[in-house]
Amino acid sequence: MMERAEDLRLSLSLSSPLIAPRTHHVAMLFHAPPEKRFLEMPLLPAAKRSEVVAAEEERAGLRGGGGSDEEDGGCGIDGSRKKLRLSKDQSAVLEDSFREHPTLNPRQKATLAQQLGLRPRQVEVWFQNRRARTKLKQTEVDCEFLKRCCETLTEENRRLQKEVQELRALKLVSPHLYMNMSPPTTLTMCPSCERVSNTNNNSSAAAAADRRGIRTTTAAGGGSVVDTAADGGILCHRPIAVRPQQS
């Protein structure tokens, strides 16, 4: 009994150095990043892997005349995405269908898959990728447009800042110029003030005419104004507006 226990302890002590590195390696893989964990994982032999992938492709019906490669919905044994190999005719039919209907309902999806000899899931993944590429292209176009708008606004902002700096410098150099400047205003007079202003203007004109030897007379009834010189000659007739007298 004692000899059997000694043999058991001896076998455990001999096997522990072989087990410990394996356990440590598994623990390191568990805490390693996913990409390193994938590289460190033991893989199947190359011949076995090729046989499995070929069988999987034949089962899914992915082999065909190469027109374009699209990602399939599933993943391979090694974690990489499988490529959906489409012929030129299949790609053309899918493109035409996408132009007509960017999103398919289940019935359209099943009909198109049956027409192309694909699975509905493969058609769905192709349409998802196609919509993603279209959205990416539109995003690039919008980004370029917004970039140009930003450059234009930046240039306009720079120009306005330069004008502001020039105006500030001019204000510092000659401040009295801005103090003497009066804002433009529009003068509005009431009718009574306007009559007074017209009377003053007429008085000034009559005084100037007297100084030049011109006498202004009003015809009977207030019809027109006659300007005569000092020697009695008539210079001109100036019609005036007749206002009816208010009783």
From Swiss-Prot:
Primary localisation category: nucleus
Cystines in this chain: none
InterPro entries linked: HD, HD-ZIP_Homeobox_LZ_Class_II, Homeobox_CS, Homeodomain-like_sf, HTH_motif, Leu_zip_homeo
UniProt tissue specificity: Expressed in seedlings, roots, stems, leaf sheaths and blades and panicles.
GO cellular component: nucleus
Keyword annotations from UniProtKB, A to Z: DNA-binding, Homeobox, Nucleus, Transcription, Transcription regulation
DNA-binding region: 79-138
Subcellular locations according to the entry: Nucleus
GO molecular function, one term: sequence-specific DNA binding
Region entry Disordered, spans: 58-81
Annotated spans, Leucine-zipper: 137-182
Described function: Probable transcription factor.
UniProt similarity note: Belongs to the HD-ZIP homeobox family. Class II subfamily.
Protein name (database record): Homeobox-leucine zipper protein HOX17
Source organism of the structure: Oryza sativa subsp. japonica
